[in-house]
Structures are given as structure tokens and as C-alpha cells.
Amino acid sequence: MSSDLTPLMRQYRELKQRYPEALLFFRVGDFYEMFYEDAVEGARLLEIALTSRDKNKTDQVPLCGVPHHAVTGYLVKLLKAGRSVALCEQVEDPRLAKGLVRREVVRVYTPGTLIESDLLTPGEPNFLASLCVSPTGAGLAWLDLSTGEFRALEMSEGWEDRMRDELIRIEPRELLVPHDQSEQLRRLFSAIVPAVTAAEMAIFDSTAARTLLLEQFQVSSLAGFGCDEKPLALSTAGALLSYVKQTQPGTRLSHVVRLTTHGSGPIMTLDRATQRNLELVRRATDGRLEGSLLSALDRTLTSMGARLLRAWVLHPLTDIVPVLERQEAVAELHADFERRSRLRAALKGVSDLERLMSRIVLAAANARDLLALKDSLKALPEINQHLAACTSPFLKQRHEQWHDLAELAVAIERTLQPDVPASVKEGGLIRDGYDPALDELRVISRDGKAWIAAIERQEREKTGIESLKIRYNQVFGYYIEITKTNLDRVPLHYARRQTLVNAERFTTQELKTLEDKVLGAEERIRTLEFELFDALRRIAATAAPRVQKLAQMLAAIDVVTGLALVASENAYCRPELTCDDRLIITDGRHPVLEQGRLPGGFIPNNVHLGGPTHRLLVITGPNMAGKSTYLRQTALIVLMAQIGSFVPAKVAVIGAVDRIFTRVGASDNLLEGQSTFMVEMTETANILHHATARSLVILDEIGRGTSTFDGLSIAWAVAETLADASRIGARTLFATHYHELTELAHSHSGVRNYNVAVRERGEEILFLRKIVEGGSDRSYGIHVARLAGLPRVVIARAQEVLARLETGMSDQDRDPDGILLPQDAATDATLPPPHPILDEMRQMDLFKMTPLEALNKLSEMKERLQQETSG
């Protein structure tokens, strides 16, 4: 078949064979074209037209293309879809090519190996992760090529759930797995990481990985990195380096200078349910940043600071010593408005140094990147000057470790023009007077253009053609253009170059000679300018370790100044962090909701947890009254305190927690085939297996997804287990509709009852959103149903049924354990008959109905209810 291919298509085939997993963007003139199966997939993902090459042939080749000047937007779309792209360029001038233009793949873009600023989200990391498993456990490593951040960990048996939690926290853009484990790992994690890339087992070999890591860090042992005795962590870390070197040939990774191995260190574990339920960095409903805790706290001014704050929110500390250091820095800047303001003003002049330096080291930076580096370095002395007067250890230490780097800023300013193009290959980069050879070539180029203008005047005079012009383009070079009306006056020695509709183009020997001289000088200018720029870029690359250290310090300064500002804006208090189990909050508020400017303002609430008498609070009250908000705000206040932030409260005393667990909300996990109740029980089981006396547990409506007595029994047993100091004894907030659970306070000394205050005025109910001591014996569900718009006939019937049920349940016995048991009166035949529609709903088998059938049935029932109401 290859013998039937044109030379161009043979060239395409050869290049495609080298990059079978990537979509090949093949440069043809002003377009990147895709062929065959790449064209079919590319057209579908990019939503562009699919056409064909050689339309007159029976076996047409599918074709689609995108313009080269707009390629970035198309790359972003494909990378978000989890695809990789091999970018193939024409690497020689088509005018000088003898035969087919030579083409090469100059860059392979994969979701996890991006370094270009226009392909990255500024405030978020872009991790490439690798994962491998063995009978004894699993290893995970992750690398942000755009910043040089490199981490690894190892887990023992039973790693699947913990690995899910970690991957959700890391959010890698691409996951590298061994080929023979790809099916298993894709099944487990593709819902978390859409781009799962299978790689050869050889790159996961621990011996090869060790050698590669020793070479990368120029050391004789990996003991200092903490992975020497962790073969799976080591294997995955080595696999990442191998993959980057394979996909980015010639790339120098000199900005990757450290591997951090995670163990059982002072970082709070946050499982995926807690990350989702507390909406730490994304809203649970739509995945957006707005409405998350991160969005409420983020006042950072640099991309580096935004990424660090995100890391702090997702990795609260359990050791209060470093937390108190952060907190003291926030307190100092909170109290000193002037210094905080000046630091923030100076930080505005700092670019993303981490990613700038990565592009410089990887030889992907342009001249504008170097100028941005220069401007950032020039802002550093003022920042350091403001730090000099700081007394908190967190800020003082950064002042003492400061690097100046003024000499690099001077070198860049002395070399580069103040206004440079985006391309580094087209000239216009280097200042006049910097290089004598370049200055000489520029004189030739400028004089040459004057000579061409003189030839234009000369030829007009000789021919008498006033409209004669000498022009230039990249295909034909310099040429004389004469309109059709003047062709009879063209001299015989003019050589025709091109015929247009209204004009013809010519050249002369004199013009050709001058063109060679001028264009030769311009080509040498471009070459020399790039060489001088590249030399400057290499000099800048040698400063990478110092700039990276500065970037980390600047990010930390940015975060604490931002936290000080948000504390000042919202009247936060400095929490008292302790090592005991107290959790006392006075006038606590929800950090996200209070910024939403709620009608009537946000109602603050108190929390008293801890000690032998307040281990578990049973919180009852109606829906929509604020129970869930109260639970979430308590967890968020604790988390904020353990990242070093001030908190939304009047007073807060917080005994540091080792974990925060949340069981909030109800939703089916359709991807894993789990019902609402199964999800609820799985999350509850995770809490009971892993919570300790130092944990904070937030439970909202345990047991809703099953029958009343089953649900009550489970909720009762779970509450007892959590409250019992001999079993778990975790500090727990337990919101429930099961009012029977308030009886736990009579039989368990560590349980206390609280409820959401309600004011009744006739049939009107006012939710006060205030948590007060004592249990509630009413849920006000019918009132909520009325607010939701249920038909009047249904509301009336519900009130009738409720009255009869309450009458039948009035006499109750209590068993020896304090559990309330209903008398037979509650189950006798005096109960009212159910509504016919309820009978119909019970008999419906939803699993045998299509979504359309279910919607039609629901519509029919609604219409019947409306007819009853109107009747």
C-alpha cells in the first residue's frame, strides 16, 4: 500500500508510526493537518469539518485541519479531553528545500507534561502522576513539570480507597500506569483521572528507577529523600522521569531538584467524601471554584501563592507547632495594615517565577519570559525591605534566607530590547550596542533597505511608470510590481516572476544581487540574535535553584498576607490551638456563606465539644433550618485553624484534630453501582474503622435510605459507638430527624442534645437558625412541604395522618437501654388508608422503566393531584 502513497503521505506515515498514541498535527503550509483515524477522532473532539484528501479516488483519506495561528485553543480542547498531541513542524525553508520539505515532531503535548503558560491554569498545579501496584501495596508519584514539584508515597495492603482519596486531593491531569496493570487501574481510577496512559513495564523497574533518580539528583544515595526503603514509591518516581524524557526528548530537568516522600507525617488525612462535602476547592454541584472554601480565602496576588494556598487547604497540619508559626505571621500582618499593604503592592509586580524558571530551564522560554523574570527580580528588594522589620519566625526566617539576584536582572536588562516579539527566531530581541557584530549587520540591513528605495526611484525614472513599486514577500523575496495598464512600457531585461489579476511581478539582476546581500544580512541577524538570546537564557537557567527557593518564599508571604487581609475584611478571630480535645467556638460563622451577603445577615452559632460530657451532640430540628450549615461551618473552622488561618468566630479554642470525617447529603454512586443507602453505609463504615478520639466527625442524617426502624437502629448504634470513649470517643456532631436519638443523652454521659430554634405563629413557622440546648420533638416536615408547593389536598391529608399517628404513638414504653418502643396502638387498623397514588408508586418497578416512561408516569400523577386540588 505504501507504494501507492504520495511522498507527503509516506512522510506522514513514518512520523505517525513513531507516535502511535498521540494525535499527529502535521504542518502543511499555514495549517496543521490530521489524516486517517486521527482526522476522524480530531474532527469529533474539536467539532470541526471532516473532509478527505484526493476526493477523486475511491479510497479517500480522511482529513481535517486547524490554522497554525490558532493552534493553542485546539490543543487545550484535546488536552482537556485527555488526549496527547505530537506537533510536527516544517524544519526547513520551503523555498530552499530540494524536493519534499523536511518535517520533524518538535513537541509532544500530553495532559500531564505541559509547561506553556497559555495551556495551564495559573492558580492550579498540573501534575503528571504514576501508579503501580504489587501484592503488598501500591506506589504513587506525582510531578509538576511546570514548577519542578516532585513527590511520592507508598501504601500497604488495602490501598484502593486511600489511593482514591489521594488522587482526588492531587487531581493529576494524567496518570501513568504499567501496561499489564492498565485495565485494573483504569477501571479503578478513570473516573478521577480521565487521561490514563499505559506505559511499558520496563520504566517501572526499581533498579532502573534508582539509577535514574541518582543521576537526576547527582547523589550517591536516596536515603535523604526518604524513598530508599520504599521500592514502589521509587519505581513510580523513576517511571515519571523516564516518561518525561521519552515524550520530551532533549529536555533538561535541572529544575527538578528534590523528591519529597510522604509518610505518616503531620498532614491531616481528608478522604474524598470530606473533600467533596466540605467543598474545599470546588463546589460539589458543578465543580466550579466559586463557592468553595478556597475561593472564600483566596486573596493571593501571585499564581505561586494561589497554588500554595490550595495545597494548604487540601493538606491541613496535625502538628500545631508549624501551624502556630503560620498563625503568628498572619497575626503580625493582620495587626500591621501599612506593612501588609506595602507587601501586597510589591507582590503585584511578581510574575509566576516557578513556571517562568521551568520554561527557562527547559529552553521553552521566550524573550518576554526573561523580561518578566527581570521585572520580578527588580521587585524583590522592596519586599525584602518590608520583611526586615518583621518579628514572627515565619517571616523573619524568609528574610534571612533571601537571595538578591540583582546581577541577573541587570544582565537581562542590558541584553534585551524593552519591547520584544513573542517569537525568538524573527529578530528584534537584542539591544543596539550589545554586540558589535550584530550592530554591523544591522547597518548593512538598514542601508540595504535604503538602496532598495533608491532602485525603486531609479526604475520609475527609467521606465516612466509612476506606479512602479518594489515589494517583498517570503515566497518571492523582493520584486518589481507593475500594473497591467503599464505592461507595454516594461524593459526587456525585466524577468517575469508572477502574474496576478491586475498586475505582474518582475525582477532584475541588480535587484537580485542587492536582495541576496540584504536578506543574507537579515538572516544572519536573526541567527545571531537567537544565539545571543539563547546564551542569556542559559545564564538565567543556572540561577534556577535560587529562583525556585525565592519563589517558594514569595508564595508563602503571599498566602499569609492574603489570609491576614481576609481575616481583616471579615472580622475573623485568632483561634487558640491546643493539644487537648476541646472544641469551643463562640459566634461561629460559615466562611463561604457569610460572604454571600444573605438577606438578614448570617446568624452565628456556638459549639461546645470535648471532655467527658460533650463528646457527641445530637442536633434535631426541621429541614431548611440550618443544621447542615452548622455542621459544615464547624468542620471548616477547624480546618482553617489547622492551616494557620484566622477563623470566622468571636472566640475559638480548637484542640487539633487528626482527621475530619463527614457524612453529609445523599446521592447514588451510579458509576460504581451503589444506591444512596449503600453510599451512606460505606462512608459511615469508613468513619467507624478509622476515626480516633482525636478526630472530628460530622454526621448528617444517618439511616435515611432504608426503613424507619432499620435506619433508627443503625443511627442509634453508630452514635453509641462514636460517643463511647472506650471504643472511639470522637468529637461528633450528629444531625438527625430521628427524635428518638435524643434519648441517648439519658443513658450516655458524653451525649448532649441541641436543636434549631423555631418560632411558631399560628400556622406560620419562622426558622431562627439558632442552635440551642435541648432536644426537639417536631420536624415541621409538613410546613416545609407547604413551602415547597405541595398541593393543598396533600398537605391536608398529611396533617390528618400525622394527627392519627401521634395519637396512636402517645403511650410508649422504654426498654432497659433507653430505646423508645411504640405500643401496638401505633400499628393497629386505625391508621388511615394510604392515598391511591402512594400505592401506585410502591408497585412501580423503576429499574424496568425507561427515563421517559418514568417522567410520563410522574406527569400523569401530578395532573391527577392537581385535578383533586382544583376539585
Regions found by a protein language model. Give the residues of each.
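Active-site phosphate-binding and catalytic loops of NTP-dependent enzymes
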Residues: C88, P111-L120, T251, A388-F394, ...
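C-terminal tails and terminal domains of large nucleic-acid-associated
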Residues: P834-G871
